Amino acid sequence: MYVSRLLLFLAPLLVKGQLSGSVGPLTSVSSKSQTKTCNVLDYGAVADKSTDIGPALSSAWDECADGGVVYIPPGDYAIETWVKLSGGKACAIQLDGIIYRTGTDGGNMIMIEHTSDFEFFSSTSKGAFQGYGYEFHAKGSSDGPRILRLYDVSDFSVHDVALVDSPLFHFSMDTCSNGEVYNMAIRGGNMGGLDGIDVWSTNVWIHDVEVTNKDECVTVKSPSKNILVENIYCNWSGGCAMGSLGTDTDISDIVYRNVYTWKSNQMYMVKSNGGSGTVSNLVLENFIGHGNAYSLDIDSAWSSMSTIEGDGVELKNVTIRNWKGTEADGSQRGPIKVKCASGAPCTDVTVEDFAMWTESGDEQTYVCENAFGDGFCLADGDGTSTFTTTLTASAAPSGYSAPSMDADLETAFGTDSEIPIPTIPTSFYPGATPYSALAGASVSSSQVPAASSSAEAKFVASPATSSPTATSTAISSVDPVSAATTTATSHGHGKSHHKHQCRAHRH
């Protein structure tokens, strides 16, 4: 079976909320390329940063969609007309060049739909999209295209590419299944509407990704099930989130683990305002934050969202575990806010090993409303009553100190000048080794399209507080194919204890 296919053994023992089955392509890029390789240069593409690559990319896809590799060699390409690449099986797009937006239409620059056994990657880890979103944003416009969208794609991976300065969203996965996304850098402007990764899908593993923007970092939307998000670096971003949630919300079995958030809107937010449906079996563990406006922010009356008809979205069986670090101003925006609707209270919520402290002032607040469970301002009960509780802490909890990342940005990227294409990092969370080495780590400069950098990883069933151990076999695309084997284990952080001096006010 293909080496980039993630095999899940001991399935009955897997922790609830993790993946429900295998993820990733079914066949290797090496095998696909032996079937056929469609070099876009042979279909009219020119690496001159001005000739539209759109028609050549579409033609190459038509030739290789039923088995093969569409190869975009190193070089600078322009894209003026967007491409919708539909159908196909056992196919891949190997982006080793850089594609620069020159068109101005809305929509999606690249859309992949109704496809299975698919891989989108750079074998050098240097492939990128430059969206030049600042050309829209500097004029005050929030219009323009998105960069990459996958719709109804199964058994897939996206990795080792950078998505930069999209006029709108950078990357979305809509109604996809059995996917793996990793080793990516996403860099957008400092304004809303420039989402990093949005996913509403089933059985998807997103890991080892850095996002800079001012909106969603990695966000789960409805409907979604069995989404595992790990080793995420929100580096001056909007922060990770769930939502916005509306009518008939259906989200379950979601795990976020090892999330580092710096100078962002929040460390994690669940946002809704009215609506209906359920979010169940949510785990948020091993979070580190510094300088963020909000930390844990569950808000069922989010004022930035128009009110939707319904009693609210019900949250149940939610665990928040092992959060450390500091928030910008704990008296204005305390590190815990769990505000649930009276008609749809939150139940079975647990907050444990949570130690954060304010960077400004000498006190912070914890606010809970109609939220039932164990920890801090949560109330005992089954959700049949209503309440609001505010706790004020005037002493720092023990164990709140947490490491920072060397690559923390000193300032955000603006909206009126070009944003540089970054190098994909090799660290995404303090002390955690990425599950797969960068594809370009063992690739020579004499690059040819021959094989993938994807990796075989076998999950070992583990407690929810631990990250799975992955054994990765990286395959370079040098001809002849060569392999390098690395073993990577993601390390969790130990538990911390906290003591608070609090004043409680219940209404």
From Swiss-Prot:
Gene Ontology molecular function terms on file: polygalacturonase activity; rhamnogalacturonan alpha-L-rhamnopyranosyl-(1->4)-alpha-D-galactopyranosyluronide lyase activity
Signal peptide limits: 1-21
Biased composition (Low complexity): 462-491
Key words of the record: Carbohydrate metabolism, Cell wall biogenesis/degradation, Disulfide bond, Glycoprotein, Glycosidase, Hydrolase, Polysaccharide degradation, Secreted, Signal
Enzyme class, spelled out: hydrolase
Disulfide partners: C38-C64, C217-C234, C340-C346, C368-C377
Subcellular location as annotated: Secreted
Record Gene3D superfamilies: Single-stranded right-handed beta-helix, Pectin lyase-like
Glycosylated residue positions: N235, N317
Listed GO biological process terms: cell wall organization; pectin catabolic process
Main location: secreted
Active-site residue numbers: D215 (proton donor), H290
Presence of keyword Cell wall biogenesis/degradation: yes
Entry EC no(s): 3.2.1.171
Region of interest (Disordered), residue spans: 462-507
Biased composition annotated in UniProt, kind: Basic residues: 492-507
Annotated SUPFAM superfamilies: Pectin lyase-like
Entry's Gene Ontology cellular component terms: extracellular region
Catalytic reactions of this protein: Endohydrolysis of alpha-D-GalA-(1->2)-alpha-L-Rha glycosidic bond in the rhamnogalacturonan I backbone with initial inversion of anomeric configuration releasing oligosaccharides with beta-D-GalA at the reducing end
UniProt similarity note: Belongs to the glycosyl hydrolase 28 family.
Functional summary from the UniProt entry: Pectinolytic enzymes consist of four classes of enzymes: pectine lyase, polygalacturonase, pectin methylesterase and rhamnogalacturonase. Hydrolyzes alpha-D-galacturonopyranosyl-(1,2)-alpha-L-rhamnopyranosyl linkages in the backbone of the hairy regions of pectins. Active against linseed rhamnogalacturonan.
UniProt-recorded name of the protein: Rhamnogalacturonase A
Record gene name: rhgA
